[in-house]
Amino acid sequence: MQVSVETTQGLERRLTISVPAEQIEKAVSDSLKNEAKRARIPGFRPGKVPVSVINKRYGKAIRQEITGEVMQRNFIEAIIAEKLNPAGAPTFVPGETDAENFQFVATFEIYPEVELKGLDAIEVEQPTAEVTDADVDAMIETLRKQHATFEAVEREAAEGDKAKIDFVGSIDGEEFEGGKAEDFELQLGSGRMIPGFESGVEGHKAGEAFDIDVTFPEDYHAENLKGKVAKFAITLKEVQAANLPEVNDEFAKLFGVADGGLEALKVEIRKNMSRELEQALKANVKDQVLNGLLEQNEIELPKALIDGEVNVLRQQAMQRFGNQAANMPELPADLFTEQAERRVKVGLLLGEVIKTNELKADDERVQALIASMASAYEDPQEVIEYYNNNQEMMQNMRNVALEEQAVEALLKTAKVTEKAVQFEEFMNKATGRA
């Protein structure tokens, strides 16, 4: 086998490979003979079909198959010999062929050489927080509101009330699409509507008709409404006040806490909040570390890896549409390109961190991750056993553990400063509610 390597552009490589033509001819001949023994063709006894007949019927397909196998086999031998690491599947193009040699060209991308830089320049502000009694009480108050019942009242609407309204919106005297509704139920103070709408309903009684002026935010999702001043003609049809359940042992039973009453519920709430806080703190630090790693390191990315990641993201997006996806056109690649590039770059850089630090997934950490996740379910042990008996799920958890270990390795050289934060403020930012 003769091999020549050519760098065409960036990470793309072109191998010109020449092998003895006999490799193909012998394999084709053997395959035709084997097919002749197996073939069942009218007019011929089983096993007695002439090779010439088989060649006429199947020769072209057999030769194509054998040629593909020969190219694949010799390509693998060539990249091993040349110490090349393909980042995607090659494309094969048969070249010049004579009685002596068969030549073909393989074009593919290789992984970039990654040399980590600026690890000591990564800056991380590590938040620290804890769940206080006040945080637990605030969560209980939230749960009370979620389990509130409502009854009609004859008074002015106030924050926390539920209002049933009809409304018609207009801009410069013209109604706009989506700006009209009847018997619309709105919880005042929920932040569901644009700023000024809910507060504009407060202070009015059922039966009143009134107008409010509001301005759509500059980042509003509808392009034609961004920054526009609108007038809403509103009819308040009913005001309902919330009746909150008392906080006692009966309240605890609403959440499946049969034994231990209210105190047991508080323990469970604190445990769940602490788990969520720990996950959010980890995610915050991880994002900072990865952002710093990306800023300090520029590497060329194989297009094959980006295309593959785009397809993964596209499939995930389509799955979220459920049954509607079948009637939708394929989502364009450029919707996912930026995210795909980031994921590929992070993967390559973290791979080098793992390699440099000789990291391997820690089994204890893997089990701790599974146990933490399982604790959110009704039967944690069942979830743990499910993971431990599922090879694919276990590999996913090993990858998560290995990524955590890589982030921790980067933290050792990063510039880290601690900052105390409040639970509610931090979690609101983490969940996008701030």
Curated annotation (Swiss-Prot):
EC number(s) on record?
Answer: 5.2.1.8
Q: Which UniProt keywords apply?
A: Cell cycle, Cell division, Chaperone, Cytoplasm, Isomerase, Rotamase
Looking at the Swiss-Prot or TrEMBL record, what is one Pfam family this protein matches? Trigger_N
- Where in the numbering of this chain does the PPIase FKBP-type domain appear? 160-245
Q: What is one GO biological process annotated to this record?
A: protein transport
Q: Can the keyword Signal be found in this entry's annotation?
A: no
Q: Which SUPFAM superfamilies match?
A: FKBP-like (SSF54534), Triger factor/SurA peptide-binding domain-like (SSF109998), Trigger factor ribosome-binding domain (SSF102735)
Instruction: Write down the top EC class of this protein.
Output: isomerase
Q: Which reaction does it catalyse?
A: [protein]-peptidylproline (omega=180) = [protein]-peptidylproline (omega=0)
Any one GO molecular function term: protein folding chaperone
Q: Which residues form a coiled coil?
A: none
Which cysteines pair up through disulfides? They are none
Family (UniProt): Belongs to the FKBP-type PPIase family. Tig subfamily.
HAMAP family from the xrefs? Answer: Trigger_factor_Tig
Per the record, the domain comment is: Consists of 3 domains; the N-terminus binds the ribosome, the middle domain has PPIase activity, while the C-terminus has intrinsic chaperone activity on its own.
Q: Which PANTHER family match?
A: TRIGGER FACTOR CHAPERONE AND PEPTIDYL-PROLYL CIS/TRANS ISOMERASE, TRIGGER FACTOR-LIKE PROTEIN TIG, CHLOROPLASTIC
Q: What is this protein called?
A: Trigger factor
